Regions:
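Bacterial N-terminal signal peptides
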Residues: 11-17
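N-terminal Sec-pathway targeting helices
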Residues: 1-11
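Residue-level detector of conserved, function-critical positions
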Residues: 21-215
Length: 215
């Protein structure tokens, strides 16, 4: 009598073990994976092609359903751009806090304390609190071939006017170089390459023509 009971007990344990293994595998297959580490407290995870941000100290997810976000090593500002439901916002890379909720149709990285964002097809600049510093007065150029980053360097940023011409503005939103070029690239070693529609030239760090458009 004892032997059949022993066999039944072994079979029961085997069944439980199999069920636990199946459950573990199903959980593992559907579980999220670590995507990136932004700081000791803030990490991103991916599951079903969607990202989430989590504060590792509290264990709480601060943002979920993210479509894409900047990599941790893409730049070093405290706020990171993310996209959710076709809108852009910013989270704090150190805490994971959703500082500026997703509300803009386009957004660039923060540089020198400001970031370009787009609302109603107009470009403006905000600070780290989401406050508008430069009004939404510039038309958004949809020509992706130009690949011009609307990012401040040394107090200046490339910008387009209503005619589609590119110039340079300062942090007050004032034109310091009138828009007359097809595009002006972000500076490399203080020099900016410009294109006038036919030839390329170079501006120096004072925005004077260093090399005329002859190349």
């Amino acid at each position: 009598m004892g032997q059949p009971l022993g066999i039944i007990a072994v079979l029961c344990l085997l069944w439980v073990s199999i069920m636990l293994t199946i459950g573990f595998c199903e959980h593992y297959e559907s579980d999220e994976q670590l995507a990136d580490i932004y700081s000791s407290e803030c990490r991103s995870f991916i599951s079903d092609e969607k990202y989430s941000i989590r504060n590792m100290t509290t264990g709480k997810t601060t943002i979920d359903g993210i479509d894409w976000l900047f990599a941790a090593d893409a730049y070093t500002d405290s706020l990171v751009v993310y996209s959710k439901n076709f809108k852009r916002g910013y989270f704090d890379r150190y805490t994971g806090v959703n500082v500026i909720p997703a509300q803009y149709t386009h957004a660039w990285i923060f540089s020198e304390g400001l970031a370009a964002v787009v609302l109603n097809n107009k470009v403006g600049f905000i600070d780290h609190q989401g406050k508008t510093v430069i009004d939404f007065q510039f038309p958004y150029a949809k020509d992706n071939k130009k690949q011009v980053g609307l990012v401040f360097h040394d107090g200046y940023s490339s910008m387009y006017d209503a005619t589609g011409k590119c110039g340079i503005i300062n942090k007050k939103g004032e034109w310091v170089l009138k828009p007359s070029y097809e595009y002006i690239q972000n500076p490399q070693y203080g020099k900016r390459v410009f294109y006038d529609g036919k030839m390329y030239g170079v501006l120096d760090d004072s925005l004077h023509v260093l090399l005329p458009a002859e190349y």
